[in-house]
C-alpha cells in the first residue's frame, strides 16, 4: 500500500473550509455573517445567562396544535401500504435527480444515518428523534450535501400519509426500507419520533468555518489528540470524521483513532463501529465528478431554489456529473443487492493513494482491473475506497473484526443489523416510547425496566404509605433529596434517566458524589423495609415498587413541608414504576448521566469551568423545565434545606423545611447588600446594609434570580404578598413534572 501525503491542500484554494471533504460534503465557502448586522442582546452581553433556550419548541410554533397526538395519528397508518410506497420511491429513478444504478438505497441510507448519527452521549443531544435534519444548521452542513434531494424524493410519501407519519420517522425509516429492499434482514424498526418545528438549541462547536477543528481540539498535538466534550464529531459540519483522514491527512491509522473516539461518543463499541461502516458502505457511492465549486447550501441558496442547495455547474449537475463530497468512490457497484462484496474488495486488493477527479484523497486498487459497474452504464471503474474504509483493514482491532467477517459474513450481517437498529433508536429513550409492530426485543442500551406484573396501590394504600414514611424517622430533607436524586437524572434530550427503575439504588448512581452516597445508604434501607412490609401484607395482589415508593416518599415530604408553612396541598402521585436490576443496568452507559452540576442542589463537581448559573439553565433544559418552573423549583428546594452536603448557601429563610416563598422575599430585600466572600471561592455574602452583619450566603445559582432581568421578573412574582399560594402550587406542579418526566406510559394516548 503506497501513500503520498506531501500535498494535503484542498483542491479549491479559494474555499473557506479547513480541509478537503467528508464522506458526502462539498467544497464550498463557509457562510459569512452579514456585516454590520443589528446587534442582539447576546452580542452586547455574551456572558449573560440566556433562559430563552428553556422556551424553544413551544406549541406556538407547532402547526399541528397542542392537542395533536402523534401516537393516535400513527395508529391509523396502513403500515404495509406505507412500506410498499417507500420502496417504490427507492426503486424509481427521477429525471430531476437520477438514481445511481436506478435505485436510491445508498442515498436514503446516508440520509437516515446522518440523521441518527448526530447523537452524542455526553448530553444526549442530536439523533434522528425529532426530524432536525430539515432545519439549519444540519440541512446545510457540508456532510449533509444533497440530502435535501433525498427528503424531496420522500415528499410524495409525506404528502400522501400526512400527519400519520412524522418527518422524523420517515427520514429514519427510509434507510431501513432501503436495506430491506436490497435483501438485507434488519432487526426491526420502531416508530414514535415526533417532529420539532424549529432548529434544536445545540452547541455544535465554536469553529467559525465549515470543516474547522481547531477549537474542539484546543491546539492539541497528534500525540494527545483529545476531543473536547460534549462534541461527537471531529470537525465542524461533519457527522463523525473526515474520511480523508484527520484534517485531510490521508492516514488510515490516524483516521481509525478519530473513528473510534467519535463512534464511541455515539455509544458504539469497536464491533458496532466496524459493522456500521462495513454495512453502511455495502450499497451506494460517493460523488466527486469534477473539480468545481458547487452553489450555496440550502440556507444560503437564492429564494427561487426553494430550499435546495449545492447546485452543481458541471455537466448536467447530476447523475455521473454530481459533485457532493469531492470523493468519487464506489464500494461494491450496486444499490439493490446485499452482499459481502465490500470486505471481499477491501481484502482482495492492495491499495494505493490517489485523488478523485475533484482532488480529494482516496484509495484505488493497485494493478486492478476495472470491474466495478458504472452507475449510469458507462465504462467500468477500478475498485476504490475511502481512507476511513482502509482503516477497517489497517487498524489492528478493526482489522481483526473485519477479517473474521470476511470468512463469516453471517456474523457481519447480524452485527450490522443490531448496530443499525441501535443507531436508529439510541436517542428515543425507553421502549415504552416505541410504536408499531416491528419493534425488536429490548436491549440493555435501552435501559429496560420490568413490566408491571401486579396490582397497583390505590388511594387508601397511598395515604397509609405516606403516613408510614413520615413516621419512619426519616426527615423531610432526606426524603426530598432521595426523590430528587432518583428523578433528576432524567435527560429530555435522549429520554434517559429518571425515577422509573429505582436505579438510584444501583451502580453507578448510588455512588455518584452528587447523590450523597452516605445519605442514600441511610434512607434506602428504611424505604426498602417499608416496601417489603407493605408487599407482604397487602391484599389483592397489590405491591409497590421501590421506584414508586421513593417518589411517593418525596411527595409526602413536600406535603408536610407545605403544611408546616400553613398550606394544605395534595402532591399528585401516579403509581406504575418498576425496579430495574443491576443486570439490566449498563454501568458504563449510565456513567455519562452523572451530573456535573445541579444548581437545584447547589452542587457542582470540582473542575467545572462553565459558570454555575449557565449549568443551572442546562440542567433545567435537560429536565424539560420552563424558566418559571426552574425558578419555583429552586426557590422551593432552597427553603426545604436540601442543598448538597447540607450547605446553607441560598437557604434564605428562618424556617428551613417549611415550603414558603421566603427565598424570593429575602433575595429581593434591598436591605441586603451582596459581595463576594473573601474566604470562600464562588460564594457570596449578603450583609445587612445598616449593621454590616452577614445575614445569608449564596452561590451564583441563587443570585442569578436577582441579577438576570428575566429571572428577576419571575422571582418578583413569587415574592409578592399575593403569590404565596401560587408559589406553593407552582412548586408542586414543577416537582410532579420532574418526578414523572420518564413516565411515557402516562402520556402516549
Curated annotation (Swiss-Prot):
Residue location of crosslink Tryptophyl-tyrosyl-methioninium (Tyr-Met) (with W-113): 240-266
Bias kind Polar residues: ranges: 14-24
Region named Disordered: 1-40
Pfam families assigned to the protein according to its UniProt record, in alphabetical order: peroxidase
GO MF: catalase activity; heme binding; metal ion binding
Cross-link (Tryptophyl-tyrosyl-methioninium (Trp-Tyr) (with M-266)): 113-240
Gene Ontology biological-process entries: cellular response to hydrogen peroxide; hydrogen peroxide catabolic process
Active site: 114 (proton acceptor)
Entry-linked InterPro entries: Catalase_peroxidase, Haem_peroxidase, Haem_peroxidase_sf, Peroxidases_AS, Peroxidases_heam-ligand_BS
Cofactor binding, note field: Binds 1 heme b (iron(II)-protoporphyrin IX) group per dimer.
Keywords annotated in UniProt: Heme, Hydrogen peroxide, Iron, Metal-binding, Oxidoreductase, Peroxidase
Cofactor(s), names only, from the UniProt record: heme b
Top enzyme category: oxidoreductase
Binding site for heme b: 281
One Gene Ontology cellular component: cytosol
Site residues by UniProt (Transition state stabilizer): 110
EC number: 1.11.1.21
Oxidoreductase among keywords: yes
Catalysis performed (reactions): H2O2 + AH2 = A + 2 H2O; 2 H2O2 = O2 + 2 H2O
TM annotation in the entry: none
Ranges of biased composition (kind: Basic and acidic residues): 1-12
HAMAP family membership: Catal_peroxid
Family per similarity comment: Belongs to the peroxidase family. Peroxidase/catalase subfamily.
Protein name according to UniProt: Catalase-peroxidase
Gene designation: katG
